Amino acid sequence: MTILFLTMVISYLSCMKATPMKEVSIRGQGSLAYPGLRTQGNLETLSGPNDATRGLTSLADTFEHVIEELLDERQVIQPSKENKDADLYSSRVMLSSQVPLEPPLLFLLEEYKNYLDAANMSMRVRRHSDPARRGELSVCDSTSEWVTAAEKKTAVDMSGATVTVLEKVPVPKGQLKQYFYETKCSTKGYAKEGCRGIDKRYWNSQCRTTQSYVRALTTDNKKRVGWRFIRIDTSCVCTLTIKRGR
């Protein structure tokens, strides 16, 4: 599904007339221990003529270029001299020497696509489609944040066994910390009363955190270290049960 999503985004962006960036510096390092982790694209320099429309088209070209780099499994990008530790991405998992400042790339791409859709609307349609103006609210409130392996400590793998999540991953230049981008139901506000918009006369509702599998460096109860798929919190959904006797 991830490859399909990236392919659709590339097709969408390729239809736009984008002005190439004058200079794009990308830093990163391929991971020998875990091929599934890809390098982070870092846009260091943006320069060019002062055109009101150039920023949007240049950004589209940049995203297309970054996606192509992420999809190229054979390419190994050498780290720059200024950054000895490369930040490595894999969906909701990241290896970095410091706490990530932004959500994973796929989340940013989704927000960017929504921005492009809004930019193509007229001002009147844009105001009408604004969720805040229509009074739209999510059924369940959720929170997302980066957590470290030190905070997770243990997790459940695909075989149902409990494994220990390693806090640091060895790399040629030292060690990097494992970070996980988790999404869970908010414990504040309306969530305690059930889901929004549900008729309580007929339905019992509850906001529940669901999990998905991501790959991480772990050790099992026999002290065997390896990359395994583990479960982390990835979404907040509304579950319904019909009230009896109605």
UniProtKB/Swiss-Prot annotation:
Question: InterPro entries in the record, alphabetically?
Answer: Brain-der_neurotrophic_factor, Cystine-knot_cytokine, Nerve_growth_factor-like, Nerve_growth_factor-rel, Nerve_growth_factor_CS
List, alphabetically, the Gene3D superfamilies matched. Answer: Cystine-knot cytokines
So which residues have sugars stuck on them?
Answer: 120
Q: Does the keyword Disulfide bond apply?
A: yes
Superkingdom, natural source = Eukaryota
Q: Name one GO molecular function term.
A: nerve growth factor receptor binding
What positions belong to the pro-peptide in this record?
Answer: 19-127
| Subcellular localization(s) per the UniProt record | Secreted
GO terms under biological process: cell surface receptor protein tyrosine kinase signaling pathway; modulation of chemical synaptic transmission; negative regulation of neuron apoptotic process; nerve development; nerve growth factor signaling pathway; neuron projection morphogenesis
- Gene Ontology annotations for the cellular component aspect, listed alphabetically: axon; dendrite; extracellular space; synaptic vesicle
Give UniProt keywords alphabetically: Cleavage on pair of basic residues, Disulfide bond, Glycoprotein, Growth factor, Secreted, Signal
Disulphide bonds annotated for this chain are 140-207, 185-236, 195-238
The cross-references to SMART domains, in alphabetical order and at most eight, read: NGF
Signal peptide positions on this chain: 1-18
Member of which family?
Belongs to the NGF-beta family.
Q: Please explain the role this protein plays, according to its UniProt record.
A: Promotes the survival of neuronal populations that are all located either in the central nervous system or directly connected to it.
The UniProt entry, under PANTHER family, shows: BRAIN-DERIVED NEUROTROPHIC FACTOR, NERVE GROWTH FACTOR NGF -RELATED
Q: What is this protein called?
A: Neurotrophic factor BDNF precursor form
Q: Organism source for this protein?
A: Ptyas major (Chinese green snake)
